[in-house]
């Protein structure tokens, strides 16, 4: 119990400390805010909870050009994990509710990250155009195509927005599997656990220029991303049920 209380206290401290540093850096440089404040926030938060991150096929993530990174979402610890793992500047597509979070919302806004609504709106159309325009010459973009967290870890239906962005932008798409966050923060039971392992795996980049245009291309991209993630997720579920 004492160790758990310590983790909570450290979480408040690290979020406050790195959040304040992010507030200072973000107006001047999103790159510095991400690579210093956000990355170390992820690392120290994972350390506070005793989380070990195991990464596979990191070399499949291009670092010399902008990409769209799509990941499966099951816990807020997914965000801490990719923040700790990805060493270069990125921007994330987030739900508008994030703007209400202390420090995180303000830092994200100042850093130029992107915000969309849960159910889609006219504002989202403008945000999509902004992402497509900026990613061609700017940093990589990270998004969760499910649009929300999966309680049991299984893939939820994908939203179309992320795939539309990828097809319009014409940049490679890298699929990133993150497994284990739900074992640290159990959303169903609203409880936290210590000393867990989170696994991260990257898959081969998808060249969207080789896909058909329009709806067929978008659907092909969606099925490819799902085809990477789903078998791996089912393997982890089987292992946990043994």
What are the residue ranges of the model-derived segments?
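Membrane-interfacial terminal anchoring regions of lipid-handling membrane enzymes
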Residues: 1-26, 36, 59-62, 133, ...
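Hydrophobic alpha-helical segments typical of transmembrane helices
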Residues: 41, 78-81, 94, 103, ...
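A short, well-structured juxtamembrane/interface segment
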Residues: 40-66
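Catalytic core of membrane glycerolipid acyltransferases/transacylases, capturing the structured
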Residues: 18-35, 47-49, 63-121
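Thr-Gly-centered strand-to-loop micro-motif
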Residues: 56, 93-95, 117-118, 145, ...
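Non-catalytic C-terminal accessory region of glycerolipid acyltransferases
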Residues: 125-242
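Generic preference for hydrophobic
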Residues: 55, 69, 92-93, 200-202
């Amino acid at each position: 119990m004492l160790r758990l209380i310590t983790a909570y206290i450290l979480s408040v401290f690290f979020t406050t400390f790195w959040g304040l540093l992010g507030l200072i850096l973000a107006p001047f440089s999103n790159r510095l805010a991400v690579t210093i404040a956000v990355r170390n926030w992820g690392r120290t938060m994972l350390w506070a909870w005793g989380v070990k991150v195991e990464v596979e096929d990191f070399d499949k993530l291009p670092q010399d050009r902008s990409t769209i990174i799509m990941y499966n979402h099951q816990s807020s610890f997914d965000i801490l994990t990719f923040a700790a793992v990805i060493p270069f500047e990125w921007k994330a597509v987030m739900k508008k509710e994030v703007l209400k979070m202390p420090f995180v919302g303000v830092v994200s806004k100042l850093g130029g990250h992107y915000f969309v609504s849960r159910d889609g709106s006219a504002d989202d159309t403008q945000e999509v155009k902004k992402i497509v325009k900026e990613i061609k010459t700017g940093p990589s973009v990270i998004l969760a195509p499910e649009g929300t967290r999966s309680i049991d870890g299984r893939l939820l239906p994908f939203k179309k927005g992320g795939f539309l962005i990828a097809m319009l932008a014409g940049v490679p798409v890298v699929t990133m599997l993150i497994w284990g966050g739900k074992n640290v923060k159990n959303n169903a039971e609203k409880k936290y656990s210590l000393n867990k392992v989170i696994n991260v795996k990257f898959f081969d980049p998808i060249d969207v220029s080789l896909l058909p245009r329009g709806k067929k291309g978008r659907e092909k991209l969606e099925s490819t991303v799902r085809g990477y993630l789903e078998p791996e997720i089912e393997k982890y579920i089987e292992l946990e049920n043994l």
